[in-house]
Amino acid sequence: MTERLTNLWPAPLAAQPLNATVTVPGSKSLSNRYLILAALGSKPVTLIGLLRSRDTDLMMGALEALGVRCDVDSATDTTVTVTPPVSGRVHGNVNVFCGLAGTVMRFVPGLALFADGPVNFDGDEQAYARPMKPVLDGLEQLGATVDYHGEVGRLPFTITPPATLPAAQAQVSIDSSGSSQFISGLLLISSKLPGGLHLAHTGEKTPSLPHIRMTVADVTGAGGAVEADESARTWTVEPRAMQLPSKVTVEPDLSNAAPFLGAALIAGGTVRVPHWPETTTQPGGLLPGYLEQMGAKVSFPTIDGVRYCEVTGDGTVRGLGTFDLTAAGEIAPSLAAILVFADKSTDMVGIGHLRGHETNRLEALVNEIRRVGGAAEELPDGLRIEPVPAETLHGAVMETYADHRMATFAAMLGLRIPDIEVINVSTTRKTLPDFVGMWSGMLRQ
């Protein structure tokens, strides 16, 4: 174990089929994109339904360090008004703390291009292992200077903005194979460049393309003009004044719905999540289709004007054979938990980039599946999970690696495997501040 055996959380066993409605907080991906775009405007923007979690609080802290005001409504802390600096330039000679938040460490450096002095970036010790170089290479191509205070291409570092930004259209080439956030981080700020941006991804594959599409849609919604050629892996952005509408409502986090909706397949019964959008740019929007392939019954009833995603299972799970999860790798841990109980093996592929997430998620998933008696192995680009007899599975103290999705993965296994205890379940605060209460509440309904 690499974490102290303190604050163990006994994952509750599902004593009966579920019948629960679970309200999921706002999307982290959308929340942090909207916060960046609001900071790039010239007028205040009120964000309604903003996720309040460690990652979004870190983002607001980073923006406030740069001189952006983030005023939390006294009546509800999920309503936040963002006011850009009056000068139109963010502050330099400041320190930005990223924690372990990929969206903070990869989106906020772009804002430093427009600062009036150098900006220092640091984070949790575990964040020093997360790759950063592609987005920083991109900023260097735009004229910024990056000084590393540790390993090149990783936190901590200082960004000094250029004396002048490129007047003509900037040409930037990076290899974003390790994370779609490198592309998104540059696209979010590109409209503010005097000549716009032509961005090329030089890698063979583009990870999590839906997240990039989300960024493009959000930039467009703030007044940007983006031409995406996904087959050529290029994005061309025109210079535009950016301004989100005065009020923006954040969709629920559909990836965070995965443990709850997936619970219906593991424990049997029905779980409903309200406010499910008809259309969405979130990769989690693919989740209902994936669960259906695994044997769930999925429907989208509208009750009192609210659209729900309703998932019903009977405790049986269909394995998926070779299953390409390139489009939605962030829900791989939740799907892996379900597939531990499947009737045949599954090769989840297209998710090699998960090795660079909060932890090496592929290695972590293999370790923890084996820890409870399951069968799994890493593949070059993914993960293989094979069925084992039910009596082979057993309780264990499960590691979370300071990774919120590994904590929810362990909780899902605990629905069906007795005596699972989870180390540091509080790591779920990264995106679900009250995960333990929500999980217990689902089982009590």
Tell me what each language-model feature is:
Residues 1-445:
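Short, structured segments at the rim of ligand-binding sites
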